[in-house]
A protein has these predicted regions:
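Membrane-integral, polyisoprenol-dependent glycosyltransferases
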Residues: 2-342, 504-509
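Membrane-embedded architecture of ER/inner-membrane glycosylation machinery
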Residues: 2-4, 166, 249, 281-515
Length: 515
């Protein structure tokens, strides 16, 4: 019994380390990243400043991008931990942890416990989940609620128990309160496709139109929408439903366009270091298709992949809404992986890329068209510390050793490289990105705050400035006497005015406009 239990204990330890390292290690060390982290965090702070916890504002203007649930969670975290990066990110880390735990619990019902633990560890240390579990946005919250609804719906379809259906409606209602219609669309469409394939649309219709379930959804989701519609009226409908939902699918929002194959590299990179496992599942589609549960999980991934590939607006994290089922399938088929070289090659290339990154940045500088990014990247060298190179080199060395070793289980090797990668990215790679992009914003804000300067933002979208500044920062055309935060390249565009430099770093300037 001890010998049989030993592998499970190892996987338990790896899964716990994977979750702790991916979502909580150095969670508050990096400054908030713009645009999204800055926008969510500042909107949460303005709820406190306005004494209004029903509607969201960003720099004094109504913000209709997302519903209220993530802001409530961030507000609770700020109340508990204070105004800092950890507090803003903690709800995402907590939701990502719950997402992994739910995936493990679901997988354990149908597969050996070791495979369920593999699914949890693979999921927690995959690059895409690692990132989304650490950022102060609504996406980790949405993912756990989509996963909860999809698991509950399957359990209802399998057992017929109404309790699982009620759990699904509750999760969908919370998802609608977290990010809107997408939380309804995914379980609705995937279950329709599955029941259609199984020629059982009657069961689907009974579940979808269950009166008690619809009532539960309405009780969970609709009160806030009713209140905000009463308060904001058509502006909310236009801003949230039409612009940020219909508009995202039908057109390109905020420049986030992409081709039909946009998500192919996104999925391959986002699955690192487990890309080979993903490819293995895709080569076993016929086998997957003939198992009801595996077919359901594959349909979940396929619908999300196709739907967002057809969408006019594309962002990398959208495809994660369908990856939960794929992570379970990757764990199920991991035991059949034999080639150490093939399995570990993607993560080796990742570490080699990190080693070469400083040189790649330097070589590519002349080809960067935007003067702001060119100036910011020109100072990148100072942020690549010896620790960065030691981490990337050690990761490559461990991976090469794993390629030679024949004793350790291949899936275990992949998870260990995933844990090394996530810990190293948090400790050494994120500080590089933060130093280049966000440190100038934070430093400028702290200078303005310490001197009690009245600042406006001009031709710059950096809401994290307001978080560190401690108050909303209006955006408008500058006038003589204004203190302006902007990009250095924009100074030449000041309409006939001069300026006095207060702060300058990496293409960001804080200036006083003179007549």
């Amino acid at each position: 019994m001890t010998e049989a239990a030993s592998p499970a204990r190892v996987w338990i330890a790896l899964a716990i380390l994977a979750v702790a390292g991916s979502f909580f290690f150095a969670l508050g060390s990096a400054p908030l990243f713009d645009v999204d982290e800055g926008a969510f965090s500042e909107a949460t702070l303005e709820m406190f400043q306005r004494g209004d916890f029903l509607s969201t504002y960003l720099n004094g203007e109504p913000r209709y991008d997302k519903p209220i649930l993530i802001y409530w969670l961030q507000a609770a975290s700020v109340a508990a931990f204070g105004i800092n990066e950890f507090a803003f990110r903690f709800p995402s880390a907590l939701c990502a942890t719950l997402w992994v735990v739910l995936t493990f619990l679901f997988a354990r019902r149908y597969f050996p416990v070791e495979r369920a633990l593999v699914a949890a560890a693979v999921m927690a240390t995959s690059l895409g989940v690692y990132v989304i579990g650490r950022v102060a946005t609504a996406d980790a919250l949405l993912n756990v609620l989509i996963a909860a609804s999809m698991f509950a719906v399957w359990l209802h379809l399998e057992t017929g128990r109404p309790g699982w259906l009620m759990a699904a409606f509750a999760a969908i209602g919370l998802g609608f309160l977290a990010k809107g219609p997408v939380a309804v669309l995914i379980p609705l469409a995937v279950t329709f496709a599955f029941c259609l394939l199984r020629r059982d649309l009657k069961t689907w219709a009974r579940a979808v139109f269950d009166p008690l379930g619809l009532l539960l959804f309405a009780v969970v989701a609709l009160p806030w929408y009713a209140l905000i519609l009463h308060r904001e009226g058509w502006a909310f409908v236009q801003g949230f439903f039409l612009k940020h939902n219909v508009g995202r699918f039908g057109g390109t929002l905020q420049g986030h366009a992409g081709s039909l194959v946009y998500y192919v590299p996104v999925v391959l990179i986002g699955s690192l270091p487990f890309t080979t496992l993903l490819i293995r599942v895709l080569t076993r589609v016929r086998e997957v298709w003939h198992d009801d549960l595996q077919c359901y999980l594959l349909l979940w991934f396929a619908f999300v992949f196709v739907f967002f590939s057809l969408s006019g607006t594309k962002l990398p994290h959208y495809v994660l809404y369908g990856m939960t089922g794929m992570f379970i399938l990757m764990a199920v088929y991991a035991s059949g992986l034999r080639s150490r070289l093939w399995a570990l090659l993607p993560v080796l290339l990742f570490f080699v890329f990190l080693l070469a990154l400083p040189q790649l940045v330097e070589v590519s500088l002349p080809r960067v068209p935007d003067a702001y990014y060119r100036e910011a990247l020109s100072n990148a060298g100072r942020y690549f510390t010896w620790g960065y190179f030691a981490f990337a080199g050690a990761g490559a060395a461990v991976t090469l050793w794993f390629m030679r070793d024949r004793r350790i289980e291949l899936a275990r090797k992949l998870v260990v490289t995933g844990i090394l990668a996530t810990l190293g990215i948090s400790a050494f790679v994120m500080p590089v990105a933060a130093g280049i992009q966000q440190e100038p914003i934070r430093e400028a804000a702290r200078i303005a705050r310490s001197r009690n300067l009245d600042v406006i933002m001009w031709r710059l979208n950096a809401p994290s400035f307001s978080v560190y500044y401690g108050r909303p920062t209006p955006s408008r055309e500058p006038r003589p006497g204004d203190i302006v935060i902007t990009k250095a390249r924009r100074l030449a565009e000041l309409p006939g005015y001069g300026h006095e430099l207060i702060y300058s770093k990496n293409g960001i300037v804080l200036v006083r406009v003179t007549g």
